[in-house]
A protein has these predicted regions:
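Absolute protein N-terminus
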Residues: 1-2, 94
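Active-site-flanking beta-strand signature of metal-NTP-handling nucleotidyl enzymes
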Residues: 2-8
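Short, surface-exposed ligand-recognition loops at beta-strand->loop->(often short) alpha-helix junctions
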Residues: 10-15
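Short amphipathic alpha-helices within nucleic acid-binding modules
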Residues: 16, 57-67
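Short amphipathic alpha-helices in soluble, non-transmembrane regions
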Residues: 20-23, 66-70
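Short, glycine- and small/hydrophobic-rich beta-strand elements in well-ordered beta-sheets
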Residues: 27-49
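Glycine-rich beta-strand-turn "strand-cap" elements at beta-sheet edges
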Residues: 40-45, 75-94
Length: 94
């Protein structure tokens, strides 16, 4: 099992665009083989910050996800619209 916590910090004027595109990404991602969880969150104190909690059956499933057209579309506009993007791996303790 692969657990990822992703932080996406939108440029303040691009918050709604990132939110819209992120929700499209979620819909497509849940159709993928190996996706156990792909849940987006928006910070209450800083609405331009989004968090994704992802669980994949294997790293190979996640790598295949990163090569899909919907992920490539989402990543294509990062330079102009995203201030920060960070991916962290986590290990379930229990």
């Amino acid at each position: 099992m692969l657990v990822l916590i992703v932080n996406i910090k939108a440029k303040s004027e691009k918050t709604e665009l990132i939110k819209t595109e992120l929700l499209k990404l979620v819909e497509e991602t849940y159709k993928e083989v190996g996706c156990t969880k792909f849940d987006p969150h928006q910070e209450e104190e800083d609405p331009s910050s989004f968090w994704l909690y992802e669980i994949w059956e294997t790293e190979a499933h996640w790598k295949a996800h990163m090569e899909t057209e919907h992920v490539k579309h989402f990543l294509a506009f990062f330079d102009e619209n995203v201030e920060k993007f960070d991916v962290r791996r986590a290990e379930k303790l229990i």
